[in-house]
């Protein structure tokens, strides 16, 4: 069977425990990687995506016990919480991420204070605005207008899913939400939910997420979102307020520099 077909089937069985990010992004990221499967009685029980430096995907059917070997050449591994104990990760730093899912069947009503309003990003003229909002919301992330333009060239791009929240009095955008929709497997994903620091704790983030979910409800069968567990803004709490569910934890493991 074609590897990508197997990948999609396994992903749709449980999107949050099979990949830490949306499937389309994982497929793009691993173009050129080595892809392997092991089967028992024509049933896939083990799946690996790797290259010389990185173990991107490791999945094992819970009915089987296979003990993998960490290659000395790995400088990075991505492992679900279910599998991390199978690996010796003593020489790796560990950054934890959550991944949650929404069934899009029970989307809460959008409640936004009348001081604010939603509008769609103008892709022709507001790439700089998009990058500026993102940069103002992070101390460790810098996104250029050129990078934002590249996002619009992906097959999952849908301009109607790029949404700004505007302060009606100041007539200025104060929050940004970007979602994507993979029509191949009917997956929606939230990629950027950013509220300027001075406008946080007013419920704007919840309103923005619910607004995007209502848009995705007409396009997708489910929606996913990922984020860092130790983020000071606690995005997981925001998404759970909007009925995202799940308990999947992913580990982004990077080999300590003195071990290279």
Positions of PLM-derived features:
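Conserved donor-binding loop and adjoining core beta-sheet/short helix segment
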Residues: 8, 14, 18-71, 174-197
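Short amphipathic alpha-helix that is part of the acyltransferase structural core
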Residues: 1-24, 111-143
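Cytosolic beta-strand hydrophobic patch enriched in CBS
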Residues: 34-40, 162-167, 225
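Acyl-donor-binding surface of acyltransferase catalytic domains
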Residues: 44-115, 251-255
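Conserved GNAT acetyl-CoA-binding A-motif
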Residues: 71-81, 216-228
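A conserved beta-strand-loop-helix scaffold within acyl/acetyltransferase catalytic domains
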Residues: 49-51, 140-195
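Conserved active-site tyrosine of GNAT-family acetyltransferases
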Residues: 84-89, 235-240, 244
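Conserved acetyl-CoA-binding loop-helix of GNAT-fold acetyltransferases
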Residues: 62-71, 192-197, 201-217, 236-241
């Amino acid at each position: 069977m074609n590897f990508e077909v197997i990948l999609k089937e396994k992903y749709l069985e449980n999107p949050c425990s099979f990949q830490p990010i949306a499937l389309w992004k994982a497929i793009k990221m691993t173009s050129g990687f080595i892809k392997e499967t092991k089967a028992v009685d024509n049933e896939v029980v083990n799946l690996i995506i790797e290259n010389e430096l990185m173990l991107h995907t490791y999945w094992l059917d819970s009915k089987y016990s296979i003990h993998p070997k960490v290659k000395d050449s790995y400088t990075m591994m991505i492992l679900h919480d279910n599998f991390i104990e199978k690996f010796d990760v003593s020489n790796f730093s560990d950054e934890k991420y959550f991944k949650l899912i929404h069934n899009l069947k029970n989307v809460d009503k959008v409640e936004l204070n009348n001081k604010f309003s939603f509008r769609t990003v103008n892709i022709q003229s507001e790439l700089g605005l998009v990058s500026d909002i993102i940069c103002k919301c992070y101390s460790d992330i810098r996104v250029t207008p050129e990078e934002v333009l590249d996002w619009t060239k992906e097959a999952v791009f849908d301009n109607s899913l790029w949404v700004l929240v505007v302060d009606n009095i100041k007539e200025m955008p104060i929050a940004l939400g970007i979602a994507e929709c993979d029509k191949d497997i009917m997956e929606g994903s939230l990629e950027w939910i950013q509220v300027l620091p001075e406008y946080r704790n007013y419920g704007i983030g919840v309103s923005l997420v619910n607004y995007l979910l209502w848009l995705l409800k007409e396009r997708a069968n489910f929606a996913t979102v990922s984020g860092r567990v130790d983020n000071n803004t606690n995005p997981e709490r925001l998404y759970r307020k909007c009925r995202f569910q799940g308990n999947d934890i992913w580990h982004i493991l990077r080999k300590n520099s003195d071990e290279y």
